[in-house]
Swiss-Prot record:
Record bears the keyword Transmembrane: no
Descriptive protein name: tRNA-dihydrouridine(20a/20b) synthase [NAD(P)+]-like
Function per UniProt: Catalyzes the synthesis of dihydrouridine, a modified base found in the D-loop of most tRNAs.
Organism, scientific name: Mus musculus (Mouse)
Xref: InterPro entries: Aldolase_TIM, DUS-like_FMN-bd, DUS_fam, tRNA_hU_synthase_CS
Length: 324
């Protein structure tokens, strides 16, 4: 767990409280937890383009607690990385609360992943299987609440919906009674992958609880984010793939601007982002602005220097691009 010598007192006195943000009446724009992708460098980038709140990738709480190596590789932050929510996959209340205690000096809160539909996660008792285990969710939330002393430290959950929406509403009401700070709702069932998002279900959930609700699913632009926010009456929207393709979307850009690409280069070089991650993000960002032939060439590059040469040759040097 690396925090770039971030003083605990500074971390605990973060000026932007996400709970207050959700009660502001303004659209709260959230970067989703994305395995391999929503790490410090990418969070730093989207914060430059009007993202209000960022999540870490999903972290296995048991591994995080038991392994220093896991902590060092899975969680890195710095003074500018706030407000920040650390998302954990957990199936044990004690281990989750242990993990929460480790990160509470460096984050605004934790989130329990109750929505991951991947088979391995559900087989291990993580993710979306928890929407059918409200008692376990209750125990995990209560244990974190009992052990983390800071009243400003948030505990949230991210869920998918049931086929029977009444069960989801019941789950959300129970979570609210337990002390959950807010709930992010991905508007699909566990079985659904690319079907249309059930925004009507998210709206109904919002109408049946008093805590903030965040809408998630198939949001690709700021206009779509605003439409979903108004349609559902929720307090915020969470975006994953839309931000991968265009980290500047919350600032109103329809496609990734060149300045954003060069910002990513600067941030990655400064933070020492591994090449594969650095390159993969650029492939997502440049999807709409490169031809098929250009993609073949760019995607085959195998070093940071080759990528920098390509960008300079095709889009001008950094200073020129930043003036566009």
């Amino acid at each position: 767990m690396r925090s770039d010598s971030l003083p605990t007192t500074i971390c605990q006195e973060r000026k932007k409280d996400p709970i207050e943000m959700f009660h502001s009446g303004q659209l709260v724009k959230v970067c989703a937890p994305m395995v391999r992708y929503s790490k410090l460098a990418f969070r730093t980038l989207v914060r430059k383009y009007s993202c209000d709140l960022c999540y870490t990738p999903m972290i296995i709480a048991a591994d995080f607690v038991r392994s220093i190596k896991a902590r060092d590789s899975e969680f890195t932050t710095n003074q500018g990385d706030c407000p920040l929510i650390v998302q954990f996959a957990a199936n044990d209340a004690r281990l989750l609360s242990d993990a929460a205690l480790l990160v509470c000096p460096y984050a605004n809160g934790i989130d329990i992943n109750c929505g991951c539909p991947q088979r391995w996660a559900m087989a291990d008792g993580y993710g979306a299987c928890l929407i059918n285990k409200p008692e376990l969710v209750h125990d995990m939330v209560r244990q974190v609440r009992n052990r983390v002393e800071s009243p400003r430290f948030s505990v949230s959950i991210k869920i998918r919906i049931h086929d029977d929406l009444a069960r989801t509403i019941d789950l959300c009401r129970k979570a609210e009674a337990t002390g959950v700070s807010w709930i992010t709702v991905h508007g699909r069932t566990v079985e659904e992958r690319h079907q249309p998002v059930h925004y009507d279900a998210i709206k109904m959930i919002k109408e049946n609880v008093s805590i903030p609700i965040v809408a998630n699913g198939d949001i690709r632009s700021l206009k779509e984010a605003e439409n979903v926010w108004q349609m559902t009456g929720t307090d915020g929207v969470m975006v994953a793939r839309g931000l991968l393709a265009n980290p500047a979307m919350f600032a109103g850009y329809e496609e990734t601007p060149l300045k954003c690409i060069w910002d990513w280069v600067d941030i990655s070089l400064e933070l020492g982002t591994p090449f594969m991650c650095f390159h993969q993000h650029l492939m997502y960002m440049m999807e709409k602005i490169t031809s098929r032939q250009e993609k073949r060439v760019f995607n085959a590059l195998s070093s940071t220097s080759a990528v920098l040469d390509y960008l300079t040759d095709h889009y001008g040097d950094e200073s020129l691009s930043k003036s566009l």
